[in-house]
Amino acid sequence: MSTGNAAIRGAEHFGTVSVAMVTPFHKDGTIDLKAGVELAGYLVDKGCDSLVLAGTTGESPTTTNEEKINLLKAVRAELGDSVKLIAGTGTNNTASTIELSRLSQDAGADSLLVVTPYYSRPSQEGLFQHFTAVADSVDLPICLYDIPSRSVVPIELDTIQRLSEHENIQAVKDAKGKLPEALQLLQNTDLAWYSGDDPLNLPFLSVGATGFISVIGHLAADRLRALRDAYDQGDLAGAQQIAASLAPLERAQGRLGGVTMVKAALKLRGKDVGAPRLPILEVDPAELDQLEQDLQDAGV
């Protein structure tokens, strides 16, 4: 694993250390914009230079376009240009994705995160045409989100290669985890690469990723910043130590699910962002002691 000079490709649009931010809700289930703005400010103070709003961890399937846009506008109004705002706009409906992408552009997004269409299992040519249609519809940089564990269908290497020729398609959030493919695409395209799976943050840096779009960063954004800085400075041992220290948070996420874990963990640390919306549930009270232990083991 080589070290030093972490990639900066794409950082001007997508940042380097990003959190896929949860969407706070009031007790009655309505969106809590004030808490959303406060959480965004907290994450920026902890070291994030970009945030994903209304992504998977932001409960995009169960929030309306109006809620998504209102959150984006509220965070932009409060934080200004101090952070890059990446709007999650991907759905399994091309027309709906285009509509939300245009709304997000008008609301002040710096870039877009567009997930692979899920459930309908399109062909690779269908994926190519879907992403191309979205990219043609806006004037913003787009990050493809490749997550076959949720979408079932991966974006194959050849499809990403073809999509990279579109001027607006500039990055990939990789939750597929095939590092040799990532390395090949980084060498053969101008795409920026982002780890979309926290346990692989350090390995992705080693093949040329610019940074991370993290879930556990809600609780340890400062440590993720330190991890990237250590790697960039050639301190592999330091980067490895930080990565290992975050394993309890990664285990908790794997056990409970990202939204459930983050919302419960933030509440344990005095930041109540409300419960998830159905069909995602709050953490089982029987799990709270173990979650508290995970947080303590990770030093947060």
From Swiss-Prot:
Site (described: Part of a proton relay during catalysis): T56, Y119
Main localization (coarse): cytoplasm
SUPFAM superfamilies the UniProt entry points to: Aldolase
Pfam families hit by this protein: DHDPS
Keyword Cytoplasm applies: yes
Record-listed pyruvate binding positions: T57, I213
GO CC entries: cytosol
Cellular compartment(s): Cytoplasm
Catalyzed chemical reaction(s): L-aspartate 4-semialdehyde + pyruvate = (2S,4S)-4-hydroxy-2,3,4,5-tetrahydrodipicolinate + H2O + H(+)
UniProt-recorded Gene Ontology molecular function terms: 4-hydroxy-tetrahydrodipicolinate synthase activity
Gene3D superfamilies reported for this sequence: Aldolase class I (3.20.20.70)
Catalytic residues in the record: Y145, K173
Keywords on record: Amino-acid biosynthesis, Cytoplasm, Diaminopimelate biosynthesis, Lyase, Lysine biosynthesis, Schiff base
Pathway(s) where this gene product acts: Amino-acid biosynthesis; L-lysine biosynthesis via DAP pathway; (S)-tetrahydrodipicolinate from L-aspartate: step 3/4
GO process annotations (BP): diaminopimelate biosynthetic process; lysine biosynthetic process via diaminopimelate
Similarity section: Belongs to the DapA family.
Protein role: Catalyzes the condensation of (S)-aspartate-beta-semialdehyde [(S)-ASA] and pyruvate to 4-hydroxy-tetrahydrodipicolinate (HTPA).
Assembly information from the UniProt record: Homotetramer; dimer of dimers.
Protein name per Swiss-Prot or TrEMBL: 4-hydroxy-tetrahydrodipicolinate synthase
Origin species: Corynebacterium urealyticum (strain ATCC 43042 / DSM 7109)
Phylogenetic placement of the source organism: Bacteria, Bacillati, Actinomycetota, Actinomycetes, Mycobacteriales
